[in-house]
Amino acid sequence: MAQQYQPGQRWISDSEAELGLGTILAQDGRLLTVLYPATGDTRQYSLRNAPLTRVRFSPGDQITHFEGWKLTVREVEDVDGLLVYHGIDGQNQPHTLPETQLSNFIQFRLASDRLFAGQIDPLSWFSLRYNTLQHNSKQMLSSLWGLGGVRAQPIAHQLHIAREVADRIAPRVLLADEVGLGKTIEAGLVIHRQLLSGRASRVLILVPENLQHQWLVEMRRRFNLQVALFDAERFIESDASNPFEDAQLALVALEWLVDDEKAQDALFAAGWDLMVVDEAHHLVWHEEQASPEYALVEQLAQVIPGVLLLTATPEQLGQDSHFARLRLLDPNRFHDLAAFRAESENYRPVAEAVQELLDEGRLSAKAHATIQGFLGAEGEALLAAVSDGDSQASARLIRELLDRHGTGRVLFRNTRAAIQGFPERQLHPYPLANPEQYAELPSGERAELYPEVAFQAQGETSDEERWWRFDPRVDWLIDTLKMLKRTKVLVICAHAETAMDLEDALRVRSGIPATVFHEGMSILERDRAAAYFADEEFGAQVLICSEIGSEGRNFQFAHHLVMFDLPAHPDLLEQRIGRLDRIGQKHTIQLHIPYLQNSPQERLFQWYHEGLNAFLNTCPTGNALQHQFGPRLLPLLAEGDEKAWGKLVAEARTERENLEAELHSGRDRLLELNSGGAGEGQALVEAILEQDDQFALPIYMETLFDAFGIDSEDHSENALVLKPSEKMLDASFPLGDDEGVTITYDRGQALSREDMQFLTWEHPMVQGGMDLVLSGSMGNTAVALIKNKALKPGTVLLELLYVSEVVAPRSLQLGRYLPPAALRCLLDANGNDLAARVAFETLNDQLESVPRASSNKFVQAQRDVLAKRIAAGEAKVLPTHEERVAQAQQRLAAEADEELARLTALKAVNPTVRDSEIDALRKQREDGMAALEKAALRLEAIRVLVAG
């Protein structure tokens, strides 16, 4: 029989019990709208299969009015589909309480209802529920939550930035690390941690069009974040009134958005908590005028609370451009360019003084006077202690200066010079004779730098005339691969056509196992190619990538890189090397560069090596030099004027050396210390590695897979294949693929095998599986036989699991203070609680299953006795619950008060602390304390134990 819904009726969500009591708002056609006042959430359900249970109390139940007074139900009346409860209050006065006035925070005794209804579950499910509660609680308390589950090597500076930024309310910061230090990973960590904590629920990512795929791959592969990529086609074809409203994470190309006013209107209307803008240094701003892209981002930044800008370093940008990024974050603070220049100049001597302290371990008289003038009287004691050689005082002094840094809270910028762990590079150039077949090709960059593409484009050729039959680079590549034997080699070329042709050449001419990787392949096809390359035993020796196809991928398990050709821009060159040159690379990078002599390829090699020094070192000046010398460079690549060419390379080398000297002298070591975390990040690294070594997750997941009917088989070392079995319990289990998936718990394995799912406590499969356990009712009842000689046969013990539950928005993060750990009670016949003396695991080892029919018969026979004991159980754990709530309130208040005091004091000396940030923190404290005050005990599960 179909459910009858009426506005005002109270229902509870079967899948989201934490939302509290729901109120039916409307029934519109096939949709049902329910409001959950406790959290402010609204849900829409299909009328046919809404996951809702009607809230209907019975005589004898005690219920609560929204004003807080309680009523013991004597009679229930149905008035036009709405329930009216009649009973007496705490003073034995008669009262009437319509269901519309019920407290939104009322908890339900669903476990006892199921027990007495004969819905008794297997013992294994009761244990699974208990263990799920304990693991879930532990993760909520962990400082690593949102940081440790990423498919990446834990790196100190990235973790420090992620925690520092993600733990703020509506962070507004500039991430300006040097190339290769992982700004995208830092941004992904911030997004991931903010989503998991509830600080953000909707995220907008704006990127240049050519980086959309790279971001899509990074977010999906590293963070398991399902990002919706929007372009003109998807926007037009969507049936939704506002396509953006259905996306929790939207990835949008800025070029398209600027040209589409309708899409802009929809984007503004959708509402976002956090905006991330990549390549923000390309947003053009001058005091007189801003570009359309800058103006659009500025408008979005005015209405979106959190903003992350990913950009080049301030030294690369120049002061004016750097100021333009800062004013996007806080236009009130950064409103005057001239004032900003003056402030920056005033601060430079302080940074130089700190550099002296870091380098020499002491301060000269000049540096001492500079810092004293900056800190005032309050810094005199610290300076005196520093002068006496107190290292702790030096650390405190640096912290004081950091807090006063003009942009220290909004700007994070790490440099390779300050970060350890990068590999060295070795260059191996191979000049080769230019074949005569290329001599007659038409002029143009494509023909001159990539002659094989131009040759093939001339028309159909026989197999014997294909370019890879005569191009000496192919002969060289085959010989090199044979010399390196089974060593993994990554080959990158500019075009997909070249990559595919090279695979043909290796197959036909050498039989060397190779695979290809280009933008014409689907993500799944690329994953398979990458996995084939990564396989040490049976995999390909060589992976041949096109320029675009390799974006966002990590192949650092290899250390030989062949550049079959060279890209036309130094940024692309750095991207190529960056596929292998990453923190954590254990070997020296071997760069193999074959090029055709007396050709533009040779000159481009000379430009990068002799002019830009871009092979052996990163080239932070490459973009500026390309912009400055580009107009002269391109014509000279093809011309034979040796004198003009030599002059250009020499000029570029001199300019590069000058720019690098400026960059080095402009380094702000104080800012680097703040960005690197000064040791805090390393503690996070060690904690994550320690967590990786534990076996709790694999053990737990094996029981979860067994419970849900997921078959688990060995795949290879440190890897398992999961497949749904015929007895799969719930089709909604988040396996990820109906055909099955390959998983690993090993971080190293996951980094080299991107086709495998990397399971951590944060993975959607783990979180989704735990949610299915806790949101469902399975496992909240059980009956068992206990084999213990100390107990008389027939003795009945009652095990009750309670949870301290807070109904509140996720953004308050109250699970950090009052996690839903099980409060356990084990009652004997005399009402004594034995839980402290008998551990859960110890008890479990003594239990045997009882057939369901026998269990039900026993429960029905003992119903009254069991009901009385269940009613008495809450009093046993109530003191523990109240103590936990009080401790949670104390921790929340202490943390919030400490942070409020720090920010308030900081604001007095550093204007980048926003009033809105302090106000939001104060409100969060108030709301959190109020919600904890209403924390209630909920009976989670019941297990009846009969001695036999």
From Swiss-Prot:
Domain Helicase ATP-binding residues, every copy: 164-332
Molecular function as annotated in GO: ATP binding; DNA binding; helicase activity; hydrolase activity, acting on acid anhydrides
This protein's UniProt keywords: Activator, ATP-binding, DNA-binding, Helicase, Hydrolase, Nucleotide-binding, Transcription, Transcription regulation
ATP-binding among keywords: yes
EC number(s) reported in the record: 3.6.4.-
InterPro entries the UniProt entry points to: Helicase_ATP-bd, Helicase_C-like, Helicase_RapA, P-loop_NTPase, RapA_C, SNF2-like_sf, SNF2/RAD54-like_C, SNF2_N
Record flagged with keyword Magnesium: no
Positions with a binding annotation for ATP: D177, E178, V179, G180, L181, G182, K183, T184
Stretch forming the signal peptide: none
Entry's transmembrane regions: none
Motif (DEAH box): 278-281
Organism superkingdom: Bacteria
Top enzyme category: hydrolase
Helicase C-terminal domain ranges (all copies): 473-627
SUPFAM superfamilies documented for this protein: P-loop containing nucleoside triphosphate hydrolases
Xref: PANTHER family: DNA ANNEALING HELICASE AND ENDONUCLEASE ZRANB3 FAMILY MEMBER, SWI_SNF-RELATED MATRIX-ASSOCIATED ACTIN-DEPENDENT REGULATOR OF CHROMATIN SUBFAMILY A-LIKE PROTEIN 1
General function of this protein: Transcription regulator that activates transcription by stimulating RNA polymerase (RNAP) recycling in case of stress conditions such as supercoiled DNA or high salt concentrations. Probably acts by releasing the RNAP, when it is trapped or immobilized on tightly supercoiled DNA. Does not activate transcription on linear DNA. Probably not involved in DNA repair.
Assembly notes: Interacts with the RNAP. Has a higher affinity for the core RNAP than for the holoenzyme. Its ATPase activity is stimulated by binding to RNAP.
Family: Belongs to the SNF2/RAD54 helicase family. RapA subfamily.
Official protein name in the record: RNA polymerase-associated protein RapA
Source organism per UniProt: Pseudomonas entomophila (strain L48)
Record gene name: rapA
